[in-house]
């Protein structure tokens, strides 16, 4: 249930600050969002997959913490990221 290498490379190209940027907050949030969206599609078919649902909740919590950090440190980058990903907040 992980993302393909091509999907990760596309996210890195879209959200990374430079070519090899894999650790910036924007990239981490974008990767988590893609994984969360992938898992949501999985749960439409597999409703009772509680083991994976726990992992989904962990990813959502991690994304929430990262977006809160970004909002606290750089509001302009936060608002740009939220608009680009289409997240609520």
Curated annotation (Swiss-Prot):
SUPFAM superfamilies: S15/NS1 RNA-binding domain (SSF47060). Disulfide bonds: none annotated. Part of the 30S ribosomal subunit. Forms a bridge to the 50S subunit in the 70S ribosome, contacting the 23S rRNA. Pfam families: Ribosomal_S15. Keywords: Ribonucleoprotein, Ribosomal protein, RNA-binding, rRNA-binding. GO terms for cellular component: cytosolic small ribosomal subunit. PROSITE patterns: RIBOSOMAL_S15. It comes from Shewanella baltica (strain OS185). PANTHER family: RIBOSOMAL PROTEIN S15, BACTERIAL AND ORGANELLAR (PTHR23321), SMALL RIBOSOMAL SUBUNIT PROTEIN US15M (PTHR23321:SF26). This is Small ribosomal subunit protein uS15.
């Amino acid at each position: 249930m992980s993302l393909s290498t091509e999907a990760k490379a596309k996210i890195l190209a879209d959200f990374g600050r430079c070519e090899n940027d894999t650790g910036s907050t924007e990239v981490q949030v974008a990767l988590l969002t893609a994984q969360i969206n992938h898992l949501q599609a999985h749960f439409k078919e597999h409703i009772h997959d509680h083991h994976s649902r726990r992992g989904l909740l962990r990813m959502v919590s991690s994304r929430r913490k990262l977006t809160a950090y970004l909002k606290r440190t750089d509001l302009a980058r936060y608002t740009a990221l939220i608009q680009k990903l289409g997240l609520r907040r």
